[in-house]
Amino acid sequence: MDRHNDKFTYSSRRSAEYPYAHACQGDGEVCGVAVEYPTFTTFTVNVIKNHDIEWPRLEADDFIMAIGSTRLLEDACRIAYRELIYWLERNFGFECYDAYTMLSQCGKVRLGNFVDPKYTMGGCDSQKIYRLIFPA
């Protein structure tokens, strides 16, 4: 489907297979390439019913990230941060202004792709902060 001839297979588990992975990639992948290696990788996507999101999200043990992608770089950043604010409101109990203020003070922006027709930005923040504010 792209320059690596990725093969997609679908089953009842809805998995997709990719023959290449990035060993590393600089922010933006500015010349269009990363260090890639052949691999057989299978991942599974879970569908959460009645939980709408506008843009992709990533969640790890130490951070959360919302991803925005569009032609203007600053708009991609706005999309990522807007989605992150919605996420903080819905899942972490933040008020909109408080989430916006905290991201202004603690948030990070990652440039994922700068060479395709659309730029990809990730807005992220440390989950440690939320655990301090909203202990379980």
Regions of interest found by a model, annotated:
Residues 49-102:
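A hydrophobic, small-residue-rich beta->alpha segment in the mid-to-C-terminal subdomain
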Residues 1-49, 82, 89, 96-97, ...:
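Glycine-rich anion/phosphate-binding loop at the beta-strand->alpha-helix junction
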